Regions:
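Short, charged, surface-exposed secondary-structure boundary motifs
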Residues: 9-12, 57, 169
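Conserved N-proximal alpha/beta basic substrate-recognition cap immediately N-terminal to
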Residues: 1-27, 33
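Phosphate-binding site of ATP-dependent enzymes
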Residues: 31-32, 39-45, 49-139, 149
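A structural signal for short, well-ordered beta-strand segments and their strand-loop junctions
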Residues: 1, 27, 45-47, 83, ...
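Short gly/ser/thr-rich secondary-structure transition/capping motifs
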Residues: 25-28, 150-152
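Short glycine-enriched loops at secondary-structure junctions
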Residues: 3-7, 112-114, 162-165
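ATP-dependent carboxylate activation and anion-phosphoryl transfer catalytic cores
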Residues: 133-196
Length: 196
């Protein structure tokens, strides 16, 4: 991927360029704005703008003092923006990684299914990866994003979809190609090299 694109797009924020596909989202450092967002949705996810692998992602279903302390810490006492999104119950069925290679969605995806009692499907956080065929909705979202990726010389990306919602666009080091190959014998990396 073009290094300029890696500098231009924050992976957590990039998805907001496609508001028609994302869950309700707030990017803010203001405790009052985060509180109002929570009051509107009653169950939210909060995460830093620079995290990976499921680290520092919290589900907030009560604005008790413990959760407010976490928010204060994550926002560095309201100096650092974080991303807040309405919680998507479909996450328990899988956080799907869809690879977009040379402007085309790969036909197999990886459903990262959270371990019991957790909501994080990230493999690094203990989730289990299950390869599946891409759905029509996933393909539609990927095809809408692909032209922007191509225009910015991003030839290998991994988008994350939970239920019907786009949650992230990963362009730095998208994972899950190995798991897809191991389970389906279809090789995303081979597909990537065909386009070079």
């Amino acid at each position: 991927n073009n290094p300029c694109a890696l500098k231009k797009f924050n992976e957590k924020v990039f998805a907001t360029d496609f508001p028609e596909f994302i869950p309700k989202t707030l990017i803010s450092s203001s405790i009052n704005k985060i509180r109002a967002f929570f009051d509107s949705h009653k169950k939210i996810i909060i995460k830093p703008l620079d995290g990976m692998g499921g680290t520092s992602i919290y589900k907030v279903d009560d604005l008790n003092e413990d959760n407010l302390k976490i928010i204060r810490t994550m926002t560095n006492s309201e100096k650092t923006q974080i991303i807040c999104q309405s919680f998507i119950e479909d996450v328990y069925e899988g956080d799907f990684r869809i690879l977009i290679i040379n402007g085309k969605p790969f036909p197999k995806t990886l459903a990262r299914i959270p371990k019991d009692g957790d909501f994080k499907g990230n493999l690094a956080a203990g989730g289990k990866g299950v390869a599946k065929d891409i759905t029509e909705n996933q393909k539609k979202i990927a095809e809408a994003i692909a032209p922007i990726l191509v225009k910015n010389e991003i030839s290998f990306a991994g988008i994350d979809i939970v239920g019907k919602y786009l949650t992230e666009i990963n362009i730095t080091s998208p994972t899950c190609a190995r798991e897809i190959l191991d389970q389906t014998q279809l090789n995303p990396i081979e597909e990537y090299f065909k386009g070079l």
